[in-house]
From Swiss-Prot:
Disulfide-bond pairs as recorded: none
Protein origin, superkingdom: Eukaryota
UniProt protein name: Betaine aldehyde dehydrogenase, chloroplastic
Gene Ontology MF term list: aminobutyraldehyde dehydrogenase (NAD+) activity; betaine-aldehyde dehydrogenase (NAD+) activity
Compartments where located: Plastid, Chloroplast
Amino acid sequence: MSMPIPSRQLFIDGEWREPIKKNRIPIINPSNEEIIGDIPAGSSEDIEVAVAAARRALKRNKGREWAATSGAHRARYLRAIAAKVTERKDHFVKLETIDSGKPFDEAVLDIDDVATCFEYFAGQAEAMDAKQKAPVTLPMERFKSHVLRQPIGVVGLITPWNYPLLMATWKIAPALAAGCTAVLKPSELASITCLEFGEVCNEVGLPPGVLNIVTGLGPDAGAPLAAHPDVDKVAFTGSSATGSKVMASAAQLVKPVTLELGGKSPIIVFEDVDIDQVVEWTMFGCFWTNGQICSATSRLLVHESIAAEFIDRLVKWTKNIKISDPFEEGCRLGPVISKGQYDKIMKFISTAKSEGATILCGGSRPEHLKKGYFIEPTIISDISTSMQIWREEVFGPVLCVKTFSSEDEALELANDTEYGLASAVFSKDLERCERVSKLLESGAVWVNCSQPCFVHAPWGGIKRSGFGRELGEWGIENYLNIKQVTSDISNEPWGWYKSP
């Protein structure tokens, strides 16, 4: 499908501004490798201007235009944004599909979730009003204390390319609900919908500078944003390597960060399951979003007593996946995001083969697709736990398989990773599922499913998958400072020192 790609500038202080260095970055359609447009290439100079705009918006009129307003006031803007995104849903869905390569049906769900997220955090903003001046019980009657929840300030939001607008929304919505102002730096590999979102902000009358959007390369725009002394907090989603750099930059200024990083999530399948039902969930857990999910359950652990039958059914189901242009009806696997990502995934597969692993299906480009960054969904067996393919995040449609003989062995294999974002367990024995859930070392556990994610529930990892929680009531807390206010309500002197 061909469609015109809007040509935008940087969105700063409520205006469209050309990058100071006037550079642009080409947009490549991952489905056919053609250049379909370009985005502005922001630099540290543009970040400087954007952060200054966010700081002015935070402080303007002593915060009475945004930061110090009621949550209910800010909620009206968030609901207006949700309505506008829904109104322009078809436009956003098409742009997300062509830019990221994800199947059209998935992009529809993503944009629905964007609107849902703004609606949800509008409710959280309103609920925050009732929590203001929450009393604190003290042991001395002479004193009275309460708590204020106040925006943390100017926040830098650095977001990935696998869910371009949705992952940005996970950060924008709670930050704005809390009363923060923000500078968003989306991934240069998929920025179109984030730039278009700037137009939505103008259409709903969001005060200038409350949200600023600077596209560009990570070293040129993302790194200066993370290190900027006038940014009060950084929230980052991306690779563990880049997350470490963000954390190091923030550490120089003792600046709080929230990091949602990589994963190598396990999926444990016990012997008492409905095989076809769990096969489908296994595929969904690894091949959804073309395999490019930080929480992908890409390490399959299946009980040895059903392994042969399960893997046979899994391979047959996987070979039946429709791989095509993401706009084609029924597409269930599109291209990966870029040539660099394509080459990286293929190198993982070739290394696995050289280390002695067996490719049960996939592992190459689909024969019917000569252009585009398409990779067949790949299942790999005969794996040792020391192999690269088992230990490192691939971020593509690649599933590794091992067997286990006992619950203890399954848990040992599942937890033997430096990551801890998510896990899944399948069994008809719900007591076993509950027991295993408590012992899995991850920020999220799915029981008899994989990948469902709701704005109402907390999201985040442990270990090298990061820290902090997004979404739910925990999401807005990320962007708040808690201040205690304690008053002496007695008319009596304190009496600690003798009067002269």
